[in-house]
Regions:
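Aromatic- and glycine-rich beta-strand/loop motifs that create alpha-glucan
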Residues: 1-27, 184
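Helix-capping/transition residues at the boundaries of transmembrane alpha-helices
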Residues: 11, 87, 98-100, 176, ...
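Short hydrophobic, aromatic-rich alpha-helical segments embedded in or entering the lipid bilayer
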Residues: 208-228
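Junction motif at the cytosolic side of a transmembrane helix
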Residues: 242-262
């Protein structure tokens, strides 16, 4: 498993990958910080579960609240990226080649996922820092007070928000990887993933409010938002953890039992 992690990190730490990731992360962080601050409501109460107000952003955790609000809208993107990363390994025959050197399939799968999540964790940390810095510069233009951002409470909130977003990414990653391992076809896996996490869950939610308490994508959105009117963050966390456990078991069993012929 260690060898698999190292091998995957070699691919991820190539100069081209690092440059593209750094530029994309910086652009995303600055742009979304500006969008969140501009869209902040002047009222004392949020107009939606994922909205922010000038008052809420002026609290100690306001700086990283900008970050969590921004990334909460990128769930489908994260889901699709992990589907593609795993499904392409089948279409390119990479898994078949890797199994010649690491025949223990579950360790191979776990090693690849661990490396990707470790890389994602580093990218998230950088994104949070850049978003916070950009928000600190832009906040005065929207009458957002930033004095309490630089405090122990602000630091504690930053760590808490980082942990929440990391779990959010891990949830999408595991669900996306499981779908890719079961389906294997890149076009089909992407079609299912985009349709489900994109319009399907939200269309069903419009007709059936209880869907927010059961669908994984909606639960992940609720968790990273700190809870919604339909489901608390704690319930979302527990339910998503259950889904992730089941998805991981299905993916591991499927990968271990089925032939890798491509």
């Amino acid at each position: 498993m260690i060898a698999t992690i190292r091998g995957e990190l070699v691919k991820l730490l190539r100069r081209r990958v690092l440059v593209i990731t750094a530029v994309t992360t910086a652009v995303f962080a600055v742009a979304t910080a500006a969008i969140v601050l501009i869209s902040a409501d002047d009222g004392a109460r949020r107009v939606s579960d994922r909205g922010v107000t000038v008052a809420s952003l002026s609290n100690a955790g306001g700086g990283t609240d900008v970050f969590t609000t921004a990334v909460s809208f990128a769930g489908v993107f994260v889901f699709v990226v992990f589907i593609g990363l795993f499904a392409m390994e089948f279409s390119r025959g990479t898994f078949r080649t890797m199994l010649m050197y690491q025949p223990r399939r579950i360790r191979l799968l776990a090693g690849k996922l661990t490396a990707l999540l470790a890389f994602s964790a580093a990218v998230l940390a950088a994104a949070e820092i850049i978003t916070w810095l950009a928000a600190r510069v832009l906040a005065p233009t929207q009458d957002v007070a930033t004095g309490s951002w630089v405090s122990l409470d602000g630091l504690g909130q930053a760590v808490s928000d980082y942990g929440s977003v990391l779990f959010w990414v891990s949830g999408y990653a595991l669900l996306g990887a499981a779908l890719a391992v079961v389906v294997r076809s890149v076009p089909l896996a992407l079609a299912i993933g985009i349709a489900w996490a994109g319009p399907f869950e939200h269309i069903v939610q419009d007709a059936w409010e209880a869907a927010a308490r059961f669908f994984p994508g909606l639960l992940l959105e609720a968790f990273v938002a700190g809870g919604t009117s339909e489901v608390s963050a704690t319930r979302a966390l527990v339910t998503v953890a259950g889904y992730i456990t089941v998805a991981a078991a299905i993916a591991a069993t499927t990968f271990a039992m089925r032939d890798v012929t491509a």
